[in-house]
Amino acid sequence: MKSLSFLNHEFEAFPSPELALTDPNGLLAIGGDLRPERLLSAYYNGIFPWFNSDDPILWWSPDPRAVFIPGEIHISTSLRKYLKKQPWRITINHAFTDVMAGCAQPREKQSGTWITQEIQMAYRELHHTGHAHSIEVWEGERLIGGLYGLAIGQVFCGESMFHRKTNASKAAVAALQQHLLKMGFKLIDAQVMNPHLESLGAKAIKRIDFITLLSELRNNPVDPTTWTTKEVILELE
């Protein structure tokens, strides 16, 4: 039976994602807090927070789930040609706080953002403990795009991306895919399908299949140098 759980500030296990509501799709629990242990427990179990600044904390596990397989993200020929011409520089974990701030800026035709100050503080803490990571795209010394997310074993859980110049966020996605492939990652969680993700090659899979994949990959070790601060040279041949 589908049911909505209410969490308090005592740390407790999340309910099974299979109990999430169908309307709204995937809403599983309300309340709790954003302490690192709770956030990591959420992602470890296929759950993520998503709420507006005037809402309580809402926890989600939608069905279906949007995912990418590293190596299958679509980088068009025209985009490859475009990126080859750009004098951009791409880095990993060089400016996590600035990337989050960029992602938090309201989009066109939007008045607010779900990446509240509370969310930013929580994920900065996860970054400091080595769980949350960013990809940055630079033009000179100016940050023009990027993305951030969490690494759970061989799964990268993408959270948000932004751009200040055309295709800069796509450059970040291309760099992420290239890096994850080299480091042996098997899955990218993109959470909720939308036309933009679909155009890049995202697949919608059943929640139960996502949870199964996650359970197989979340404890797999990765190279300890995966998320050291470094520059990425895009290979676009």
UniProtKB/Swiss-Prot annotation:
Transmembrane feature ranges: none
Keywords from the named record: Acyltransferase, Cytoplasm, Transferase
Record carries keyword Iron: no
Chief place of localization: cytoplasm
Biological process annotations from GO: protein catabolic process
Subcellular location as annotated: Cytoplasm
EC numbers: 2.3.2.6
One annotated Gene Ontology cellular component of this protein: cytoplasm
Top-level taxonomic group: Bacteria
InterPro entries on file: Acyl_CoA_acyltransferase, Leu/Phe-tRNA_Trfase, Leu/Phe-tRNA_Trfase_C, Leu/Phe-tRNA_Trfase_N
Catalytic activities: N-terminal L-lysyl-[protein] + L-leucyl-tRNA(Leu) = N-terminal L-leucyl-L-lysyl-[protein] + tRNA(Leu) + H(+); N-terminal L-arginyl-[protein] + L-leucyl-tRNA(Leu) = N-terminal L-leucyl-L-arginyl-[protein] + tRNA(Leu) + H(+); L-phenylalanyl-tRNA(Phe) + an N-terminal L-alpha-aminoacyl-[protein] = an N-terminal L-phenylalanyl-L-alpha-aminoacyl-[protein] + tRNA(Phe)
SUPFAM superfamilies, sorted: Acyl-CoA N-acyltransferases (Nat)
Molecular-function GO terms, alphabetical: leucyl-tRNA--protein transferase activity
Family: Belongs to the L/F-transferase family.
Task performed by this protein: Functions in the N-end rule pathway of protein degradation where it conjugates Leu, Phe and, less efficiently, Met from aminoacyl-tRNAs to the N-termini of proteins containing an N-terminal arginine or lysine.
Protein's name in the database: Leucyl/phenylalanyl-tRNA--protein transferase
